[in-house]
Amino acid sequence: MTGTRILELFGPAPEPPSELGRYRILSPTAGIRVSPLQLGALSIGDAWSTDLGSMDKDSAMELLDAYAASGGNFIDTANGYQNEQSETWIGEWMASRTNRDQMVIATKFGPDYRAHELGKGLPVNYSGNHKRSLHMSVRDSLRKLQTSWIDILYLHTWDYTTSIPELMDSLHHLVQRGEVLYLGICNTPAWVVSAANTYAQQQGKTQFSVYQGRWNPLRREIERDILPMARHFGMAVTVYDALGSGKFQSRDMLARRKDQGEGLRAIYGGEQTALEEAMSKALGVVAAQHGTESVTAVALAYLLAKAPYVFPIIGGRKIQHLHDNIQALSLRLSQEEIKYLESVGDFDPGFPYDMAGVDPADTGIATPIVAQAAPMAFVQRSKAIGYAESNKGSQTSG
């Protein structure tokens, strides 16, 4: 029997199979190590095939295998996705591959997840932000995922019907029991998250460590209040709709889809708008500057360059799309490229930012009330890993 040398145990790990396996710390308040792109499991299942396209169980297992083989360990699902098939199939996959300990699983509670079987109106307490809904959802998610813990549990949507103390006390209880490790929240106003995290900090409870919301070069509302809030509380931001509901595609890509009998999803409008077409062209220009044809990789790279602790969710049903999206991790966008992409759309931060200005730590420019007093210089905030100027001379791409 051959032993292992001590120096080998303390030596560095080998290079990953792809940049997906160059892991990152989730957030300043959550030290778990995760892949920089999260696999979205909305399409894992066949119950919603009419709207999202068909994916049988074998294809789902192959997609999960391909993600893991590329170094991916970060999967996003929810209690009701695909009428509960998403969690169930992920659980079966982890059990058959005996890889639960290698995966970081995020799931969600809040919306009614049992109406598909029980009918509308009957499962009233299977939905909501309250303790009973939370209890049943976590009980069922643990069973479907075939696990004893959930790495990240999100509140899927704030519904204004449960008090912040009830919500945060109930979530903290699950953390104390070891059934949930980290807390997240989606689709919720910044003031609610701020109030919830402040309550948690004051009461010695577990705070939210990650926020999930919509963000892409044409939908930048998250930058107004949610992104500064996340930075203040040490939260990561996981991003859905990063590819504009699949509308960020070149003319060639759209033509190939139509030739294959696969157009854009009707649930998302069916066709590109003029603005989506213009953004796709702009993404193509930046892609060409980086020697790639992938507009989706550039759309993801845009988010990875915008702020630290940002993790885009990549969905889809095809392995080739997965590999295409992984290209984003090797791209570094400059400030000029970011501004070029943002020039296509129209984002107005509005009041009070149009009066008070924005944080000089981001811009290096004094706000009006500071500038009137004296010339000032400012320490700049840390940039994202995917921001070009933050990696000059670096040969790593993690």
Curated annotation (Swiss-Prot):
InterPro entries: AKR_Detox_Biosynth, NADP_OxRdtase_dom, NADP_OxRdtase_dom_sf. GO terms for biological process: terpenoid biosynthetic process. This is Aldo-keto reductase ausK. It holds the Pfam family Aldo_ket_red. Aldo-keto reductase; part of the gene cluster B that mediates the biosynthesis of the fungal meroterpenoid acetoxydehydroaustin. The first step of the pathway is the synthesis of 3,5-dimethylorsellinic acid by the polyketide synthase ausA. 3,5-dimethylorsellinic acid is then prenylated by the polyprenyl transferase ausN. Further epoxidation by the FAD-dependent monooxygenase ausM and cyclization by the probable terpene cyclase ausL lead to the formation of protoaustinoid A. Substrate binds at H156. The keyword Metal-binding does not apply. Homodimer. Its EC number is 1.1.1.-. It comes from Penicillium brasilianum.
